[in-house]
Amino acid sequence: MLPHAGLKMKAASLEQKNHGGDRMKRMFWLLVVAVMFSLLGLACPPIYAQEKVITLNLSNFFPPENRISVVMDQWCKEVEKRTNGRVKVTQFPGGTLTPPAQTYVGVTKGVADLGLSFFSYTIGRFPLTEVLDLPLGYKSGYIGAKLANEYYKKFRPKELDEVKVLFLTTSPPHMLFAKRPVKNLEDLQGLKIRSTGTSSKVVQALGGAPVAMPMSDAYDALSKGVVQGIIGPYEPMKGFKLAEVVSDSTEYGTAYLNANYIVMNKKKWDALPADIQKIIEQVDEEWIEKMGKLWDELDKEGKEVFIQKGGKAIVLSKEENARWAERLRPILDDYVKDMKSKGLPGDEALKFCVNYLKTYQK
């Protein structure tokens, strides 16, 4: 064999060994990378597992066709939209999940994840919050909703610690409706008036005779003469067709209203990711505005129907309003005394509400 031929063979053999070594190194590092990805896969579950859809239910006693139910359905869809489908809330209207008087307890026990109802359905359970239902001279549901949420932020009543309060809203102011004109206290004496909760105290203080019954029974009671009037907002004039069975309304300056809550089961709330909690709270702030304005729209529509049916709206004179306010003042004083006996800041709560209305109500 020629010398140069031997050298070529040795060089080729050496090159082959080097290539083999390179392949081994590449295979080694590929194996290392594969093991690393495998370990990362164990440490971090797949994205789809992390993004499992959170399903919640919402109990609401309003009928499905009621516009309150419609707006709450929009709330559900807005939450789903802003969370990119990570949260889906199904609404159960008409009290099908929990009756209105049991909604709060139903939420605390997990029967419902979220619930909407009135505080007045469970008188005595929310003593410090009941200040919102007192005859403070409300002029709109919107101002009531704004006050209710500011009040909650300031006082954080312990009676609501069992749940996550999403937001509060209120009905429009409650007026007096009767089958005959009521222009003064004398006209009201002895009249049987459908009323419940705070409204019963109002009717009694003004000299009427309160008769407890749900609003759904008011039409028959009025048409049959069981009662001669009701106390409530204008909205039922349309919603419950009460404009057909009353002839006059009396608008007085110390009107009260009913506050209602939208709350969530505390454990369900705490289990939500922080970013989802933030999104829901942002939507809630917007819905305070929407719900407050909606209640007033419904009240306006109810009054229009009332007038169209021949109803007459009586606005009390300044002097007569003062007489009514004087009759209703003991309700406020009794509330403060009752709260004091329970060790609650009723006086401070009442002052806050009164000052808020003086400052922001036009």
Please report, for each region that a protein language model flagged, where it lies by residue:
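Functionally engaged cysteine thiol sites
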Residues: M1, A148, G229
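N-terminal secretory/targeting leader peptides
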Residues: G20-G21, Q50-I143, K158-K362
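Short, low-complexity disordered leader/linker segments with a strong preference
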Residues: M1-T55, Q361-K362
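Signature of the catalytic double-stranded beta-helix
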Residues: K146-K158
